[in-house]
Amino acid sequence: MSESLSFRAAGRSDVGLVRKNNEDSGFIGKHFLLVADGMGGHAAGELASSTTVAIVAQVDNNKEKLEDLDSKLIEIPKVITKELKNAINKDSSRAGMGTTLTAAVVQENQLKVSHVGDSRAYLVRNKQISRITKDQTYIQSLIENNEITESEAKNHPQRSLLLQAIDGITESIPVITSIEIFENDKILLCSDGLTNVVTDEEILEIVNQFDYVGAVSALIEKALENGGPDNITVIVADLQKEKYENKIIVLGAAAEARNRIKLPGLEFPTDIHPFITSEFPALKSVTWLRKFAYVASFALIAVIISWGTTNWISKQFYVSNLGDNLAIFQGVNSAIGPISFSRPVQSFNLEVVVLTKDDQEVLLKGIKADS
């Protein structure tokens, strides 16, 4: 008789060093692991990946829905498609929204994965790594046809072109994969913000070096070290015979209140890992204020140049949050219109959520540091 396994998992989502918003979402539930990489303008990507978390979390919380697991894994993208279609109908600016889906669930000694898009699931066993999923991209089709190499794909101009995604328009049929799993196997789910800048060999080295918690942080830091051009979401799970009940964790866009309140028809899980900005929803833009901000930006730039204070600004440093983590910024903690007077220079493997609410509020304002 096969032995039932359970998983201990950790995850983290980071906005990266280039993007302004995090369109990735992640979920660690009682049974499910999930990474969703949203896409689309006007914050639609955040809503698409957040919707995916809400739908998967509902299935995760319902034991009856897990009885016929294969059919549920096929049904999940259909439900997400319906919700995205409703969201687009309510607001036409959301047209073009979409998301990837890589959801994994442990059932006794089997791992079942439902996959759409180019987020990935990996298996690490006996210090070897293998991909459970296959990227549904134009680039992957070229690689399989031996038209380009994996190395050439890294710099290909169409490397981000998806052949499959959940978009609220066409019905997506996920690829369902089932593999036998063993104690001490590790499962890794991630968005392409990791795999575009960190190789499989580097991922394996890090996962073998750290436990599942340390591996998550080390992988995120490696992606940031390599430029962090995209949002990065990583979940690592350690499979054990010992019964283990995970606390529910929501990552990235789905953890932000400003995204949840735009999806009033969906029920989100109560999680232990709220994003720091969850109590500070973004303010709606005001046209006249935006115009004023742009005019003021150019005026301020002229003043800065005339006063010769650029050198002074470059010598200022402060501590604040960069996504989920603490970071040091060079410059001053202010911006007018599109002009920011600071940039992140170092991110630390220390999550903001460990701070008290009072300390988080202080951190949001920035803590001046000596140069």
What residue spans do the PLM features occupy?
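PP2C/PPM-type serine/threonine phosphatase catalytic domain
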Residues: M1-A296, L300
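Short structural boundary motif marking the start of a folded domain
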Residues: L5-A10, K315-F317, D324
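Loop/turn residues immediately N-terminal
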Residues: S119, G193, K315, N325-L326
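Alpha-helical transmembrane segments
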Residues: A299, V303-W307
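Short extracytoplasmic/periplasmic juxtamembrane "stem" segments immediately C-terminal to an N-terminal membrane anchor
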Residues: S320-I339
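Extracytoplasmic/periplasmic/luminal assembly and interaction segments
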Residues: I336-S371
